[in-house]
């Protein structure tokens, strides 16, 4: 079991305005009226939403005004469990992109794009976005992209990424993306499994004040993807005239690619009408036990779940301007872009959030009138360490919500936000995962914010904390489970014909119940949730989710190292860092030079954010009798717990090497 956190004092940090007529209030009243229920508060609404989950999703479909060409025949077969992966909204026909582009005010800004170190902010109206998507889609069709084909982006958080994704979705192609900070191995581990027909990328990116050439990496990636028919290169940092793409097979500049979609007149926007369960996105697991699993998310499930979170939980409307600091390799990018469906404006920022100054995001908030800011918990902690006080340097008048995810938000960060950023803001810690491309729990405009707690479990998400016996526990740590079907679970994994990988990933711990791989604790008094870190071998420092095997693949190339072990360590706030242990090969010594070379290799092949916090020497690495490296046991030991059952180990004495390591104290 995870270490118990201190008892929460349930200190209120923010309270909702009782006079405010929110979407959540209006939805609760609508449900009470149409279903003949008495729903006095959020808790009543939540309990109904999980007990009568089919009715809940039907009511929300109606409330959210989803655009469809055919209504559903059945919401879901309620006799099926979450492990059966039931089909949702059978018979309906819709298109995800159509729902994001439906906003009628043509001149309203849909996208703002800001880049590190650039004063200029690009703006795209909803009408311009529709025209661009039509052009991208026409060019895709011209080259033979059809329903079910994979279109991928190796792209920064930019307007081009949104346009290409929406065009792919409009056709019924499946979109997948990684960000330019991924190295060659990281990209090929993902994209090679899904055999894309078309890739979009850039020639260079700027991060942390430096320009990083991208073409060599792109060339290596393209060579590893034999099914590619076309490589579209977008001049992003330099002008086209200075870029040489002649070495990249089947490559074309964006301008020339789009020209193929132009006829005598501008192409019309066409939206393929597809089943609710039609694949929209392929997302990736961390790759803990080998190649990353490819999670297929449906168009309808992603849309309705994101709309629920944006409209009901976030009270979002067309008056909002949202910026989430993310890359295209994180699910928060997909989540952010769906906000267009509410008519809100989306701000895309590409670059470091600390360059040219740590105020860069606050400057954007004041300049654009941003109302919702999303970030990683780590960024808030960094600002606090730097003693930044945005409330003294910035207006922040428009800002009503700050969202945080990626890792647990420390209690002291709540204090920092309310004291030094804005006292009236809703600070929403949100938590879910790539596996559901959304949240199990998060912000809520109708209930208080308590220090150190995520506000509530989200509507329709039957979340509990279970002990090892499979019993719900309250006020103590347990495995985060979801007990009822949800439309946002993956429809399947790519290349998992019989579904065995899918079942193993979520349903091997508790039969018929989704086990998410997180430990959490639900406060029985407030209903708030405290996240306590991962319960499996996945590494997730600062929201960058990856597997130990991705690190091992790099370290194996060093002849000085005979073996390695990569594990997370958590502090009392649930913050995570990654520790890499090296077992040296005979006649080789552990050295700072080796540590530097390994760090550099990981940075180049994967990204700077994959580099372990500490690299230490060990004399032995534990294995099971059947030859599996045992990370979980070491993770427990460095957290101060005993490993009682040692019978499965071929070398149990090695476990003692991880007791009381000086470098791991006082984290």
Swiss-Prot record:
Location relative to the cell: Cytoplasm, Cytosol
Entry's Gene Ontology BP terms: fatty acid metabolic process; positive regulation of insulin secretion
InterPro entries xrefs: Acac_CoA_synth (IPR005914), ACAS_N (IPR032387), AMP-bd_C_sf (IPR045851), AMP-binding_CS (IPR020845), AMP-dep_synth/lig_dom (IPR000873), ANL_N_sf (IPR042099)
Membrane-traversing stretches: none
SUPFAM superfamilies tied to this protein: Acetyl-CoA synthetase-like (SSF56801)
GO-annotated cellular components: cytosol
SS bond list: none
Catalytic reaction list: acetoacetate + ATP + CoA = acetoacetyl-CoA + AMP + diphosphate
Keyword terms, alphabetized: ATP-binding, Cytoplasm, Fatty acid metabolism, Ligase, Lipid metabolism, Nucleotide-binding
Main subcellular location of this protein, as a coarse class: cytoplasm
Pfam families: ACAS_N, AMP-binding
Entry function: Converts acetoacetate to acetoacetyl-CoA in the cytosol. Ketone body-utilizing enzyme, responsible for the synthesis of cholesterol and fatty acids.
Similarity annotation: Belongs to the ATP-dependent AMP-binding enzyme family.
Protein name: Acetoacetyl-CoA synthetase
């Amino acid at each position: 079991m995870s270490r118990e956190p201190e008892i929460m004092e349930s200190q209120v940090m923010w309270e909702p305005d009782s006079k405010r007529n929110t979407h959540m209030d209006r939805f609760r009243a609508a449900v009470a009226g149409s279903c003949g229920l008495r729903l006095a508060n959020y808790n009543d609404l939540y309990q109904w939403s999980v007990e009568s989950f089919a009715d809940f999703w039907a009511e929300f479909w109606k409330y959210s005004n989803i655009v469809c060409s055919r209504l559903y025949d059945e919401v879901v077969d309620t006799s099926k469990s979450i492990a059966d992966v039931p089909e949702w909204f059978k018979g309906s026909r819709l298109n995800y992109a159509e729902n994001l582009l439906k906003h009628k005010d043509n001149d309203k800004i849909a996208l703002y794009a800001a880049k590190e170190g650039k004063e200029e902010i690009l703006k795209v109206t909803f009408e311009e976005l529709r025209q661009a998507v039509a052009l991208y889609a026409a060019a895709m069709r011209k080259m033979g992209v059809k329903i079910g084909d994979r279109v991928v982006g190796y792209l920064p958080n930019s307007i081009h990424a949104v346009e290409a994704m929406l065009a792919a979705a409009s056709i019924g192609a499946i979109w997948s993306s990684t960000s330019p900070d991924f190295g060659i191995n990281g990209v090929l581990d993902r994209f090679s499994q899904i055999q894309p027909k078309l890739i979009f990328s850039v020639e260079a990116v700027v991060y942390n004040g430096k320009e990083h050439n991208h073409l060599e990496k792109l060339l290596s990636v393209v060579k590893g993807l034999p099914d590619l028919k076309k490589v579209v290169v977008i001049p992003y940092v330099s002008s086209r005239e200075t870029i040489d793409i002649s070495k990249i097979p089947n490559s074309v500049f964006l301008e020339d690619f789009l020209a193929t979609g132009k006829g005598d007149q501008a192409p019309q926007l066409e939206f393929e009408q597809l089943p609710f369960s039609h694949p929209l996105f392929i997302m990736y697991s961390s790759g803990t036990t080998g190649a990353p699993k490819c999670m297929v998310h449906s168009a309808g499930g992603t849309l309705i779940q994101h709309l629920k979170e944006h409209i009901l939980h976030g009270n979002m409307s067309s008056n909002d301007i949202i910026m989430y600091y993310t890359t295209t390799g994180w699910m928060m990018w997909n989540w952010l872009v769906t906000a267009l469906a509410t008519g809100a404006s989306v701000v895309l920022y590409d670059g470091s959030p600390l360059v040219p100054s740590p105020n860069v995001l606050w400057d954007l908030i004041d300049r654009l009138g941003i109302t919702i800011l999303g970030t990683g918990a780590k960024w808030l902690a960094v600002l606090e360490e730097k003693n930044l006080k945005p409330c003294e340097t910035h207006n922040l008048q428009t800002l009503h919500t700050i969202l945080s995810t990626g890792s647990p938000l420390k209690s002291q960060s709540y204090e920092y936000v309310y004291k030094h950023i804005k006292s009236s803001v809703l600070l929403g810690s949100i938590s879910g995962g790539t596996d559901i491309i959304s949240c199990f729990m998060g912000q809520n405009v109708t209930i208080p914010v308590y220090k150190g707690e995520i506000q509530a479990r989200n509507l329709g998400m039957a979340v509990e904390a279970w002990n090892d016996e499979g019993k719900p526990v309250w006020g103590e740590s347990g495995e985060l489970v979801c007990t009822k079907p949800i439309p946002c679970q993956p429809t399947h994994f790519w290349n998992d014909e019989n579904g065995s990988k899918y079942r193993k990933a979520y349903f091997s711990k508790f039969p018929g119940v989704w086990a998410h791989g997180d430990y959490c604790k639900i406060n029985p008094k407030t209903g708030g949730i405290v996240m306590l870190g991962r319960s499996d071998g996945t590494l997730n420092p600062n929201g960058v989710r990856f597997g130990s095997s991705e690190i091992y693949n790099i370290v194996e190339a060093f002849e000085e190292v005979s073996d390695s072990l990569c594990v997370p360590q958590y502090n009392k706030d649930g913050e995570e860092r990654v520790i890499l242990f090296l077992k040296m090969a005979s006649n080789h010594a552990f050295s700072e030079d080796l540590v530097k070379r390994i760090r550099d290799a990981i940075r180049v092949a994967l990204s700077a954010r994959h580099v372990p916090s500490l690299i230490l020497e060990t004399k032995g690495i534990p294995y099971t009798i059947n030859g599996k490296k045992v990370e979980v046991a070491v993770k427990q030991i460095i957290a101060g717990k005993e490993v009682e059952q040692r019978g499965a180990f071929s070398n149990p004495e090695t476990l003692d090497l991880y007791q009381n390591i000086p470098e791991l104290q006082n984290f």
